[in-house]
Design a protein with these regions (language model features):
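C-terminal beta-signal and adjacent terminal beta-strands/loops
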Residues: 49, 639-640, 684, 750-769, ...
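A beta-strand signature from Gram-negative outer-membrane beta-barrel systems
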Residues: 127-128, 139-184, 195
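Transmembrane beta-barrel wall of Gram-negative outer-membrane proteins
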Residues: 187-220, 224-262, 294-311, 567
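Acidic/polar loop-and-plug regions of large Gram-negative outer-membrane beta-barrel proteins
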Residues: 240-242, 247-305, 328-413, 476-493, ...
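Surface-exposed extracellular loop regions of Gram-negative outer-membrane beta-barrel proteins
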Residues: 258-260, 264-265, 269, 480-491, ...
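Outer-membrane beta-barrel signature, preferentially recognizing the C-terminal barrel domain
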Residues: 279-301, 305, 504, 554-563, ...
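Signature of Gram-negative outer-membrane beta-barrel scaffolds
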Residues: 410, 437-573, 700
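Gram-negative outer-membrane beta-barrel transporters
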Residues: 521, 635-637, 656-762, 860-864
Length: 865
């Protein structure tokens, strides 16, 4: 199970699939093929030219739809970003769910986003540490992300072994962009309120040159949620030269963005504020609104692609990618003072009076009721009382500074920067009219830089790099309270690093191949891959809780993984097709889950091993001139998965680093899509899924508190707990009209079975109560409200003497249903005090939630010329 980059591995693949492959082997010494193989081996990856299969009308219609999807992805650091995007030209269901169900953050089959691979020009763009692709990286690049090739879990493609959650390959070559100029202006009441776009593509001229450029600006002084703002500039620039059978393209793009976040809160606080979109992250400073959670995100990327058409049956594509991403997220914190957050549990009415238990004699008294009313009256009397009081924080810090004390309140910034370089190559060979062989390689090296800085001292004059959380256990003069023993008691100013500073280093090599063939009425493919990964931590501070195991490089974890897939489709005639697929693979644990407490020490998670993933699928599709239909049933099971999380454990005034190992999960369900024409202008479409996604066992858990540095082990009772923040049941019915340049859609959506992220703490065996037989009594998982949502869009395409103008209006949640819960999490704090007494406030009854936006829309004007 080890892989070393210091050794060279040769992989010999003997293939007896068909006589044509033997002929290719015999031709190996011929010049062109020899050059192709040498270039393939030396470059290392694969990709394929792709086509934009959307028609002009569909492009006009999708403009607002795509923008809506984009606005829902990764727009809040505290909401789940596990959003998967799938598409398919052959599957009605997969073709629609990407944007249609984005208001509730739908994830394809409830999979984690790391199972959804995204490529650009054949180069893998998923983050090497988390395994996920962040769609904000291509935010605003609407034209560029239109052109692409998509494959479902058991559909062969030209750029990779298909992933369990679908695989996308966007074509960013300038010659693939729609020729001409395009200008667009949009107004909305979503995360941003104004958007301007301009794009240009020359197409290939007589000398073989193509140039493409795009610029997008998105802005909101206030987004849909109060206290948020949005400021983003997207750019794209590409040039391509084709000469003979060769094409070289260079493109660069980026999306520098600054945006303010929305925080989850409890239903009690939403009720007091009379607002489902109450946001605890902002407050007033000198009478002006200020958000404490501001995200700055910029990932400039450059991509060099060489395409070589060796002959009519063979093509080589090679890409070199470089990306430097800069991600900063701020947060209000406090030191030796009261919690400044406006929805802190101690200021809520239910902390004084137990609203859940009528038999509670301690917290159901007359004085407790008076305290409840006083708290309610205070919070409900003024909006300012429900928000952060920055003026008070400044005053407290000024007073502390006058006494020579450290800042009591401050804004810290967490940085997650990354340098990523990838080299990839693909060789696409048509063996004959019925057989095809594609093979590819990917090499990548990543340096993730993780550290914390002082963003704003809020009027204070000093702060020290000391672990104030540990002061309750250790003396101020002890080594354990030092974040960096190499620089003890270091003074921290604005912009200085403190708390933690470390790098994560990841190297990966991947080899894959896909063979596909058509035999009479059967089409089949076989795909396989083998990969090697190594990872390590490089600490830049010597933490007092792990003075001999935090500074410098850790050991190196090495993994060898791989797997295979097979897919079959049978054409039964008259438009009837049956599909079958099965796959098994080993997957290396991601670097983001591999380290037990990366902010403190170099330790890897105990018992770290490859995931084992099995998946299977059965599908049926029917295609007629007036109707298309498909239904798919699937089953997937994951074993030996590793999960990691970090949360603030209020009971111990400490951060808790939690690793779950030996995790098993299973996913199964049925998906369907149906679309048929009523007349030439009217059509009806129905799509839906009924699914299950849950833990299949109780996991091993190891945890550490940031105040002690000691590990604890337990069993976490997760069996039966569902995947969170996505509907496991969703249905849609759409009535469409498309005639003489007009298009109108009316869609009814129903969502249900949306669960909140579980608290692992409340499911530790030592925390759970037990019955007389010793079995743990595990709390039920919180489920959010589902509901019905009505959407509509109307548009008109107007052809002008010079170009064409399209106008479209998209409306979401027309009936203003604000009760649909899109996600949230259970709080990880006990209902008992440290001494074992009951609290009036029950954390187990007060999860924090997000709700779907009420009525919102976008009006879009697009001019092409």
């Amino acid at each position: 199970m080890k892989f070393s980059h210091k050794k060279v591995y040769y992989l010999e693949i003997k293939c007896y699939l068909c006589p044509k492959i033997i002929e290719i082997y015999q031709l190996f010494m011929k010049k062109k093929l020899t050059l192709a193989i040498l270039a393939f081996l030396s470059s290392s990856m694969m990709t394929a030219q792709v086509e934009d299969k959307k028609t002009e009308g569909e492009g006009d219609k999708d403009e607002s739809a795509f923008t809506f999807t984009e606005s829902q992805l990764g727009e809040d650091d505290d909401m789940s970003q596990n959003v998967t995007i799938v598409n398919s030209n052959s599957n009605i269901y997969a073709n629609e769910v990407g944007y249609l169900w984005s208001p509730v953050r739908f994830r394809y089959r409830a999979f984690n986003q790391k199972y959804n691979d995204v490529y650009i020009n054949g180069a893998l763009m998923n983050d090497a540490e988390s395994g996920q692709f962040r769609y904000s990286q291509v935010g605003g690049l609407n034209n560029q992300t239109r052109s692409g090739e998509y494959s479902l879990p058991f559909e062969a493609n030209n750029f990779a072994m298909p992933s369990m959650g679908g695989t996308n390959n966007y074509n960013f070559r300038p010659s693939a962009m729609p020729i001409g100029n395009k200008a667009a202006l949009s107004v909305a009441n979503r995360n941003y309120t104004l958007r301007g776009m301009y794009s240009y593509s020359s197409g290939l001229n007589e000398k073989g040159w193509a140039v493409a450029a795009a610029l997008t600006y998105r802005w909101a002084d206030r987004g849909y949620v109060e206290g948020t703002f949005y400021n983003s500039l997207s750019y794209f620039l590409g040039i391509e030269k084709q000469t003979g059978n060769h094409s070289i393209s260079f493109v660069t793009w980026g999306n520098p963005t600054e945006r303010a976040s929305q925080g989850a809160s409890t239903d009690e606080m939403y009720w007091i504020a009379n607002n489902r979109y109450y946001n605890p992250y902002w407050g007033y400073q000198n009478g002006k609104k200020r958000n404490s959670r501001v995200i700055n995100d910029f990932a400039p990327t450059a991509l060099l692609t060489w395409d070589w058409k060796i002959n009519d049956d063979m093509k080589l594509t090679t890409s070199l990618t470089g990306k430097y991403s800069m991600y900063k997220s701020t947060k209000l914190n406090y030191n030796n003072s009261d919690n400044p957050h406006p929805d802190y549990w101690k200021v809520l009415p239910s902390s004084y009076y137990n609203v859940w238990n009528e038999d509670d004699n301690s917290y159901r008294t007359e004085s407790a009721w008076d305290a409840w009313n006083n708290a309610y009256n205070w919070l409900s009397s003024s909006k300012a009382n429900r928000q952060i009081d920055f003026d008070r924080l400044y005053a407290a810090n000024v007073g502390a500074s006058q006494q020579g004390a450290d800042a009591m309140y401050y804004i810290q910034a967490k940085h997650n920067n990354q340098l990523d370089i990838k080299l990839s190559s693909t060789l696409d060979m048509k063996l004959d009219d019925k057989q095809k062989l594609v093979m590819g390689m990917n090499l990548g090296t990543t340096k993730g830089m993780h550290y914390q800085t002082m963003d704003d001292m809020l009027g204070a004059t000093q702060f020290h790099n000391i672990n104030y959380y540990a002061l309750g256990k250790y003396d101020i003069n002890s080594e354990q309270v030092q974040y960096d023993l190499n620089n003890p008691n270091a003074k921290v100013g604005e912009g200085d690093r403190f708390g933690y500073d470390y790098n994560i280093l990841v190297d990966r090599a991947d080899f894959w191949t896909t063979y596909s063939a058509t035999l009479s009425r059967m089409h089949a493919f076989v795909s396989g891959r083998v990969s090697g990964t190594q990872m390590q931590r490089d600490g830049k501070m010597r933490n007092g809780l792990a003075k001999d195991n935090s500074y410098g490089k850790s050991g190196t974890a090495r993994f060898l993984d791989g797997g295979g897939k097979i897919g079959l489709s049978f054409n039964l005639g008259k438009g009837n097709i049956i599909q079958l697929g099965a796959g098994y693979e080993l997957r290396t644990p991601t670097a983001s889950t591999a380290f037990a407490s990366p902010e403190i020490n170099n330790d890897f998670v105990a018992n770290l091993k490859n995931e084992k993933v099995f998946s299977a699928e059965f599908g049926y599709s029917l295609s007629k001139s007036w109707m298309r239909a498909n239904v798919n049933a699937y089953y997937s099971r994951i074993k030996d998965a590793t999960e990691w999380q970090c949360f603030y454990f209020d009971d111990a005034n400490s951060f808790s680093y939690v690793s779950l190992t030996g995790v098993e999960k299973e996913y199964y369900g049925v998906e369907y899509g149906l679309k048929f024409k009523i007349t030439s202008a009217f059509s009806i479409q129905a799509i839906g899924t009924v699914s299950e996604a849950k833990y299949a066992n109780d996991a091993n858990v190891r945890y550490m508190l940031s105040t002690s540095g000691d590990y604890g082990d337990d069993i976490c009772h997760l069996k039966g707990v569902r995947e969170a923040s996505t509907p496991l049941l969703a249905q849609s019915l759409t009535l469409s009209y498309n005639n003489k340049g007009w298009f109108i859609d009316l869609t009814g959506n129903y969502y249900d079975r949306m669960y909140l992220s579980p608290s692992v703490y409340h499911r530790y065996d030592q925390i759970c109560e037990h019955d007389n037989d010793g079995n743990a009594i595990v709390p039920d998982q919180w489920e959010g409200n589902g509901g019905f949502m009505l959407d509509a869009s109307i548009g008109k395409l107007i052809r002008l003497k010079k170009g064409q103008l399209s106008i479209n209006l998209t409306l979401t949640n027309i009936l203003n249903n604000r009760d649909i819960c899109t996600g949230g999490y259970e709080q990880s704090r006990s209902d008992l005090t440290a001494s074992g007494n009951s609290r009036g406030y029950l954390f187990s009854m007060n999860p924090k939630k997000f709700y779907a936006y009420g009525t919102n829309g976008m009006l879009n004007f697009t001019y092409r010329f």
